[in-house]
Regions:
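Electropositive, gly/pro-rich neighborhoods at or near active sites that engage anionic ligands
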Residues: 1-97, 145-263, 421, 434-452
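Active-site gating loop/helix substructures
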Residues: 235, 239-298
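C-terminal functional extensions of proteins
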Residues: 2-14, 338-453
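Glycine-rich phosphate/diphosphate-binding loops and the adjacent beta-loop-alpha structural elements
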Residues: 185-211, 297-304, 330-336, 367, ...
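Acidic, Ser/Thr-rich low-complexity segments on the non-lumenal side of membrane proteins
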Residues: 110-137
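Conserved phosphate- and dinucleotide-binding cores of soluble alpha/beta proteins
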Residues: 104-113, 135-136, 141-164, 263, ...
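Structural motif
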Residues: 116-117, 291, 322, 359
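N-terminal signal-anchor transmembrane helix
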Residues: 87-118
Length: 453
């Protein structure tokens, strides 16, 4: 259609282009009157005649004043027309953005140039963290464990022969730039007595995409495009793996869902097969990261399993990224009974084989008695921060008030994101540029995060 398409009715652009042109003409007339330059002869002659008829004399000062007036009005019309023209275009190209245009542009530019953050873990703890990460950077990669063998994920794993999609779904949803309706849809679990009962729609969706695209990695990429995910979600391995735990009494328990049931103390985690290879992108994400974050999440069944995959442990040690561990706020029955924050850190170090952490973020907020009563029956207790003991390992401890205000004792993604933003800003990991403006970027990001429910 070419330039003729600009003349089509209903595109809501011509009126603002015309208004802008009127503003340009008024500015030109104002300049001509001010400098007494015969730019628009007929128009200026008419103004001179009107001035003479009104005042009875020709006043150069009055003509100059009129020129200034035309200049101001013309400039105002140009500005208004430009703003409405840009708003009209933006409302079509980016229809779901709220807030001012400049704020949107600034936030998107900053997020695109944000630090490369790789988060290693799984379970609900990881998705909680990712909800805050997407307001820090678009360069976030979640390396997710694929050892789940229970619930909907376990059924799909057995029936379709795919890696369990549950933790992958939670991470995709957490990073998605989506409407609340899409989130509810992805997390919807079928009810009743049908064969679909207990299945999560998001799990079925990912399984369908994996088959349609010819593999789980391609399926995850396609799902990310549909959900407009800010970042990437990659499985730690695409192989069919099983977790094993050697207990302190020498017994071995197989299966991620079975390990907590025996209620014994875990000595070491293992994986079957022991030589399972890392998925494409997992090792690259670790080696190319500016920040490596471990947790929060189940220590032995969500975080450590990633470190058992061939190549990932070595990549973690070799990575030059700042390495941060986020400790849980409550012990997990059957996994970390009686553990403090130091025990969590030491377990990570033992499975990697060397002290590799730079920072440990621990909760310093007390749990209310009302909240504790809900956990008494299952034996879950608040985790002690163990600040001095962790520091003795050469790790910088960052204590913070991290517990959410609801009935469940868990990390508040907003509080956690605020701590991470402050730490990353202090380490000057936002890249080159004027670090002064990062302060305003962080404030804008936190405002958006606190609006989330």
């Amino acid at each position: 259609m070419g330039w003729i398409s600009w003349l089509c009715p209903g595109i809501n652009l011509k009126r603002w282009l015309l208004l802008f042109a009127v503003g340009v003409l008024l500015c030109a007339l104002g300049l001509a009157l001010f400098f007494n330059y015969q730019l628009m002869g007929k128009a200026e002659e008419l103004l001179f005649q009107m001035t003479y008829l009104t005042t009875g004399r020709y006043s150069n000062g009055l003509i100059m004043t009129m020129g200034v007036g035309f200049l101001i009005v013309g400039f105002a019309i140009m500005v208004y027309g430009t703003r409405r023209l840009i708003s009209s275009v933006v409302s079509v190209v980016v229809p779901d953005k709220n807030g001012s245009l400049m704020e949107t542009i600034f936030m998107q530019r900053k997020l695109t140039r944000g630090p490369a953050i790789t988060v290693v873990g799984g379970g609900t703890g990881l998705s909680t963290l990712l909800r805050g990460m997407k307001y820090i950077t678009n360069n976030c990669t979640a390396v997710v464990t694929t050892a789940d063998d229970g619930g909907s994920s376990g059924r799909l794993r057995k029936e379709l022969g795919i890696i369990p999609p549950g933790d992958l779904r939670n991470c995709l949803t957490a990073l998605a730039d989506r409407e609340p309706l899409m989130e509810r849809l992805m997390q919807y679990r079928f009810q009743g007595d049908s064969p679909l009962a207990g299945h999560c729609f998001g799990n079925l969706f990912i399984a369908a995409m994996a088959q349609a695209e010819g593999g789980m990695e391609a399926g995850l990429n396609a799902t990310s495009q549909i959900l407009k995910v800010r970042g990437r979600v990659v499985p730690s391995t695409l192989e069919d793996i099983r977790l094993q735990a050697r207990m302190t009494d020498g017994s071995i328990v197989t299966g991620e869902s079975e390990i907590p049931k025996v209620r014994k103390h875990i000595k070491k985690m293992m994986m079957l097969p022991a030589d399972a290879q890392a998925a494409n992108g997992a090792i690259d994400a670790i080696l190319n990261a500016d920040v490596l974050i471990f947790g929060p999440g189940s220590l032995y069944t969500s975080v450590i399993p990633n470190l058992l995959v061939e190549g990932i442990r070595d990549a973690v040690v070799r990575s030059k990224a700042v390495k941060i561990y986020i400790c849980n706020v409550m012990t997990q029955p059957g996994e970390t009974d009686g553990y403090g924050a130091y025990d969590h850190v030491q377990a990570l170090i033992d499975h990697v084989g060397t002290q590799f952490l730079d920072y440990a973020i621990v909760n310093s907020q007390d749990v209310t008695s009302e909240q504790l009563r809900q956990y008494d029956a299952e034996g879950s207790r608040p985790i002690k921060p163990d600040i001095d003991k962790i520091r003795s390992l050469g790790i910088t401890v960052v204590p913070a008030r991290l517990i959410s205000k609801d009935d469940l004792v868990r990390h508040d993604p907003r509080k956690l994101a605020r701590v991470l933003i402050a730490l990353i800003y202090r380490l000057r990991l936002f890249g080159r540029g004027m670090q002064f403006f990062d302060y305003f970027f962080m404030r804008a990001g936190m405002k958006k995060l606190y609006k989330q429910k």
